[in-house]
């Protein structure tokens, strides 16, 4: 037992020391690490670090249908987004931390999903919008406040934290036990997957951020959201990665097609956006505003950060 305790203390001390002394900013150390871990089965290259950030926000309005042209909100790289990027770049350079994460992920992926592993390690935080971008999209001021927020599929709660100053009560749902643990540490009220629809009260804002392409019944989910949203002033803020590639993650990192398929058509971002108002109409919503934003994730030893193209909508019930 003493030997085990000593080994654990030594491991923790090594991690702490590595965090302070080692980074992958050095070309030599990064090359050494990649050579140690790369191979035919290594991860594919991501978009982090090399893409012109201006392109993350570009929308060709001429390709949008008329009803969407008038509600498009142009977004830009702002201070809140830049802070997230800077922090992610710094974390990706912690050599021994990244080695430790890689080892744990390899072992735990045999019986845990990638999402749960990230929750256990406290890594892989997502970024959808900054406080300023959230306020501009909802057309609210920094002091605006209402009663209840429900964040569906909240992950580790970092995006929830950006919205939380505007709400008196904050509810969240999450499948991953380790992510639920992260949410509870932030003092959010976690509801069960089949509980949030049956609480007996309504929500003023419901966020559904990058969830529709990762759930088994996305249209049913939209209709359930409509049924518990405050019917006059309630709003939904919904983010969706485009191009649309739906799949459901199971234990062990296996992927399956969802049982409900949304009719999203088109080959590029604008074309797929044009097909979404009809999807929302079937669930009882109309688009009040939307924008294009990068969906960012903290990086690792391979990339400073990861990025996908998001369409973020504000929906009102009809």
Curated annotation (Swiss-Prot):
One of its GO terms (molecular function) is protein-L-histidine N-pros-methyltransferase activity. Transmembrane segments: none annotated. The keyword Ribosomal protein does not apply. Keywords: Endoplasmic reticulum, Glycoprotein, Methyltransferase, Mitochondrion, Signal, Transferase. Expressed in liver, colon, small intestine, skin, kidney and to a lesser extent in spleen, lung, thymus and stomach. Not detected in fibroblast and endothelial cells. CDD domains: AdoMet_MTases. Belongs to the METTL9 family. This is Protein-L-histidine N-pros-methyltransferase. The lineage of its organism: Eukaryota, Metazoa, Chordata, Craniata, Vertebrata.
